[in-house]
Amino acid sequence: MKVRLGTIIVIAVLALEASAARPIPRPALAARLAEGPEIIGIVHWGLNTFTDREWGFGNEDPAMLNPAKFDADQIVGACKAGGIGGLVVVAKHHDGFCLWPTKTTEHNITKSPFRGGKGDYVKEMEQACRRAGIKFGVYCSPWDRNSAHYGTEKYVTDVFQQQLRELLSGGYGEIFEMWFDGANGGDGYYGGAREKRKIPGGYYRYDTETFAMVRKLQPNVCIFNEMDEADFRFCGNEQGLVDPDSRSTIGHYDGVWDHYKHVANVGAVDGTTFHPIESDFPLRKGWFYHESERGTTRSAAYLTKLYLSSVGNASTMNIGIAPNKDGLLDADDVKALSGFKTLKDALFAHEVKQGEPFNVVVMREDISKGEQVDEWEFVADGKAILRGKSIGLKRIRVLETPCAAKSCEVKVLKDGGTLQGVSFRLYRADPELVRLVLSATTESGETDTAKWMTAEQSK
């Protein structure tokens, strides 16, 4: 099959063998993939921010949660200015401290000075997201190093699942994504026991009860987890790096993480579930704010490179946001996010027609019947200048040297048998910008983005 810009022309290229039907997206997931957002964030703020830890032990004093200038609109506004279309708010981390007035534990925000003991951080963040016009999601850690009941059935039914009910039906509106990670026990306070606790496989009842409960309470929610029943999967690293030929389909999760992590970043042509990647990474060195990590904020250029690695390889991009002790996003972080949007938008600001020089190619596959493309070439004036295995939702490729071909096409060399169509668009970006982005590293310093700002951005 050859695909030309705006037109699909089918010709006999290969005698394709019939293959089994590919897994297709679930309804909620299909809508999410079609409508976005393709860039989201996950906000880590809480007692860990004040103890200078990544993981709290579970015995931290709630009195420490006393920000001087907490402003949800400042945090959310900076994220929106960075092109983020949805935020997953950490409502409870592994320390077990709940940032909303839960009835499941005394270890919650009402025992802190925040808003005079009457505050609700989750609600403030939710309302700020609604005001900004971006989507709102939640993460509630399954591991709870504070709860004396952790490791028992009572914890799952009366604490964890009940906390989910409060968050999903307790007045926080529509939840676009519910995050579940692989936090599976270890040492902790556990009500004063100060011991190590292990849990058996299936302890959280994700596949038998918990996910079904979540979907019943929030029919349009998308779930992030490695289990087959979830919608989005972990990319296998926390650097935002996705394999250039990654697929949204993947095989059954057997519960053995060492097996899964090797295939999570790539997927499988013969995968049994449609389970696209969400690539999460912290904007700074750590997920929570640490004063000692000033200067580690990813540069705008490197964030743009990670966009190409994630969204450009059919993944959702998830940026870790870490407000400081004052309850604000640091100026360095605000600037990096804003600069990222400037550079990203500049890459795609000038769409061109065939025959005009281009250096950015964006390919899309109609995945209504699953991900079908197994091998492709991008051909310019009869010569293959790009090659790959997968296309899927979106595949972005950037050329170091502009191409001025008169005729371009995507040649599908192999597919799953029910290919619905492939389209592509061409863009011409400033070669200096392309070099800046492609050469960016984690060590890249602050990026000067003024040259690529629009008139609106430069105000």
Locate the predicted segments by residue:
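Hydrophobic h-region of N-terminal signal peptides that target proteins for export
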Residues: 11-19
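Residues marking helix boundaries in flexible regions
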Residues: 9-12, 386
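Mature catalytic domains of secreted/periplasmic carbohydrate-active enzymes
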Residues: 21-430, 434-452, 456-458
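Bacterial N-terminal signal peptides that target proteins for export
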Residues: 1-7
